[in-house]
Regions:
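Helix-loop-helix hairpin linking two adjacent transmembrane segments in secondary transporters
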Residues: 147-201
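Conserved MFS/SLC helix-loop-helix module at the cytosolic interface between two early adjacent transmembrane helices
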Residues: 68-107
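Helix-breaking motifs and short loop linkers at transmembrane-helix boundaries and internal kinks
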Residues: 49, 81, 102-108, 119, ...
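Cytoplasmic helix-loop-helix junction between adjacent transmembrane helices
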Residues: 112-150
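C-terminal transmembrane helical hairpin of 12-TM major facilitator-type secondary transporters
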Residues: 302-351
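Helix-to-loop junctions at the C-terminal end of transmembrane segments
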Residues: 69-81, 288-301, 387
């Protein structure tokens, strides 16, 4: 690691105030189009004659399609253009989101959901790569955490919006209205306001551009050279990160897709009320994401921050069902569970972005996201199957999802020496430390 005297002081805010907000908006709409099926289940189940297991499969098959472009998406973002790749995929996912309103049977539903997964699949690793081109390592957990607020923001918007649409329309209306957003909002913002690198952005000041490029150049100069993508597949660190991410996605997506059903079972009421209550846990999640990411960047203990947040989420999830008869307490515990199940994100991806040489980061993050997101298929499907098997009880589902979160945390803590890279403390005015601090 270069001496701290060579590390430039942070300059400018455009990367925080322009790039990240646009990326958030794009992924909010993406996340909305993949998870609004949770609100459609009630009406769709009646129209298409589906049981809970079939609904879980329809929700989860998205993640099988999601595999297809993960590694290519990250690789193309690194070697070609994140802006162009994501811009094209926004238009393709919009087509399949809109077509969801017109399915006439279960087979068509599975096909459309699968293709929606294919279309959205490469966007996540591509945006991760884009952020790595704009933020030095010492800012990256905060940058990833800030961007990943999109998941909580999407839920806050999707839940009441979907509930409101269902008060005057049906599940087809839900897909029609929300399927327009990729064309109306996401694509124009992305194509007009995003640049692949600071050197291509006219809206970045010279000082900020020099700070970013100088910082990244010095980090990349210290990085080991790479012989090819095969190194990603040979890395035990990458495969453990895949396992961690799989366990997390089982827990998170199992909770996220079944949350509207859990809330409706707990409190009853109209779709509008269910939507409003379902959104409330994500306010906690936004706070958890920012606090955990900021603390992780400050200490450099990324693995520990992942484990602690997942443990909190797992315990709170089981308690929320155990105390389901006390509605206010149950909703509060669900909120804590959602915060824990999301707050891992910034520290996790900060670790992943540093686990391999810079040239392979896109492919590595694509592999982690691709195979890890199979948990997004398993969680909803297993959750639905367990509810059918237990006569509609969510307790067994909650226990399985919580155990999965705990397992993710336990595997992550074994990576603390490999994935927690040295971090550089920003210079304190008037004081230049002798060397950067290394934290484990």
């Amino acid at each position: 690691m270069a001496a701290a005297t060579t590390i430039p002081a942070p300059a400018g805010r455009a990367r925080w105030t322009r790039l990240i907000p646009v990326a958030i908006i794009v992924y909010v709409i993406s996340f909305m189009d993949r998870t609004n099926i949770g609100f459609a289940f009630d009406g769709m189940g009646k129209t298409l004659h589906l049981d809970s297991a079939a609904e879980g499969l329809a929700g989860g098959i998205f993640f099988i399609g999601y595999l297809a472009l993960q590694i290519p998406g990250g690789h193309l973002a690194e070697r070609w253009s994140a802006k162009k790749f994501v811009g094209i995929m926004i238009l393709i996912w919009g087509v399949f989101a809109f077509l969801s309103a017109f399915v006439q049977n279960y087979t068509q539903l599975l096909i459309v959901r699968f293709m929606l997964g294919v279309a959205e699949g490469g966007i996540w690793p591509a945006i991760l790569v884009l952020i790595s081109h704009w933020f030095p390592a010492r800012e990256r957990a905060r940058a990833y955490g800030f961007w990943m607020m999109n998941i909580a923001i999407a839920s806050i918007i999707t839940a009441p919006l979907s509930g409101w649409i269902l008060t005057w329309g049906d599940w087809r209306s839900l897909f029609l209205v929300e399927g327009i957003f990729p064309f109306l909002i996401a694509a124009p913002l992305w194509w007009l306001l995003v640049a692949d690198r600071p050197s291509q952005a006219s809206w970045v000041s010279r000082e900020e551009r020099e700070y970013i490029e100088t910082s990244l150049a010095r980090e990349n100069a210290d990085a080991p050279r790479s012989a090819g993508l095969r190194e990603v597949f040979r890395s035990s660190v990458v495969w453990r990160l895949v396992l961690v991410y799989f366990f997390i996605q089982v827990g998170f997506y199992g909770l996220n897709l079944w949350l509207p059903h859990l809330v409706k079972t707990t409190i009853g009421g109209s779709y509008l009320i269910v939507g409003a209550v379902t959104a409330s846990p994500d306010v906690f999640a936004i706070a958890g994401l920012w606090i955990n990411a900021h603390s992780a960047d400050r200490t450099g203990r990324y693995s520990l921050h992942v484990m602690v947040s997942l443990t909190i989420g797992a315990v709170a999830l089981v308690l929320s069902v155990a105390f389901g008869s006390i509605v206010a307490l149950s909703i509060f515990l669900i909120s804590i569970a959602m915060a824990g199940a999301l707050a891992y994100d910034g520290p996790f991806w900060a670790s992943a972005s540093q686990a391999v040489p810079v040239a392979l980061a896109g492919g590595a993050m694509g592999l982690i996201n691709a195979l890890g997101n199979l948990g997004g298929f398993a969680g909803p499907y297993v959750g639905g199957w367990l509810q059918d098997a237990s006569g509609g009880s969510f307790l067994s589902t909650a226990v399985v999802l919580a155990v999965s979160l705990l397992l993710g945390g336990l595997v992550m803590i074994t990576l603390r020496r490999q994935a927690d890279k040295p971090t550089v403390t920003p210079p304190v005015p008037g004081r230049v430390p002798d060397q950067a601090r290394t934290r484990r």
